[in-house]
Amino acid sequence: NYKCSVAKHYIYEDVSVGVNDFDSELWGKASVYRDFTGECMPRNFLRHDGDFSGVYLTDDTNRNDIDTVSVMKDGEYLYFRITTVDPVTAYQNGDTEWMNIRIRTKNGGETDSLGYHYAINREVFSDGTSSVQRCAPDGSFASVGRAEYFLSRNVLCIKVPLNVLKLSADNYQIEFKVNDNISDSSDVLSFYNSGDSAPIGGLSWQFGY
């Protein structure tokens, strides 16, 4: 029917995997989301009036070129497996834009200016955990819990408790994106022209529909 169709909801199998089992065959059961690669590059080009002004526009925020994001769940956790083209750069203390996952939930209430409720990995700790923070409309963040993480070369795995995101075994639908080294995460345009964002710009992927 070209006018409309009945909504199709998908079946998501419960799969449990250790956060450090980045090469487990269980990841073959995940939902896989693919990003464009090769566009995460330094920029140094003449401005539109450059022939007259000699002004160059430069950007060197390119760092981790995100390739794929795989997502699974069980009754207690969401699991993310993120791959990059080259080995992921090491986290540096205080870097709030290192390999972030931004999440929007169905009934999450107020969001930040980009429409997300949660940000993961704005802080990374030496005990193998990272922050899960609630986003506020004024651009502030408040810690609500922690996720587990494991990094091996170009693979980053994240294990997030559903209850930290106010989700459950029966309610796990999310919209999400992964981004790295965004120059101004309060400005949606920065998700187009700095660092890397998967998917690009203001777009999100959906899991659990």
Residue ranges of predicted features:
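Surface-exposed, glycine/proline- and aromatic-rich loop segments on solvent-exposed faces
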Residues: 20-129, 178-191
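Beta-strand-rich interaction surfaces with strong enrichment in secreted/lumenal proteins
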Residues: 67-71, 144-149
